[in-house]
Amino acid sequence: MAAGGALILRNDDLDAPRCRPEFVSAMFEDMRWFGLRWSEGPDIGGPYAPYAQSRRLSLYAAAFETLRRRGLIYPCDCSRQDVLRALSAPHRGDEEPIYPGTCRPAAGAVSTATRAGVNWLFRVSAGQTLSFTDSALGPHTEIAGQDFGDFLVWRKDVFPS
């Protein structure tokens, strides 16, 4: 790679009903057509296998437990419809609405709920500034809780999002 990095290709196959082997073949073909080359992946191997997300679930489960123990994630049993109703309330301008925090517990609260049957959201630190430079669009500064909010990290069907 031009910047000295390595591109590791992983196949997001967590939505089993919509994942088929022919889609993986098409992904390789499309990426090569765009001139993309990867250092390791499902078709060539490498030291960071496995390259199918579904075969890395134990790694994701361990990360989930670390986040849960640190009080950085919380369970949310709101349906999409519940969230959409809350977001339909008037809000400033045409900005993207932010999750209203309906299920958000007090900061640092550690949930003992299981992963199954409930969505889990990552708690952002409101007011924290995130600055980065987009190679195409230039410098950006985003403020947690204002420009973006808590986000889904684990789905109620027991898969990472």
In which residue ranges do the predicted regions lie?
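N-terminal Rossmann-like or analogous alpha/beta NTP/dinucleotide-binding catalytic cores
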Residues: 1-92
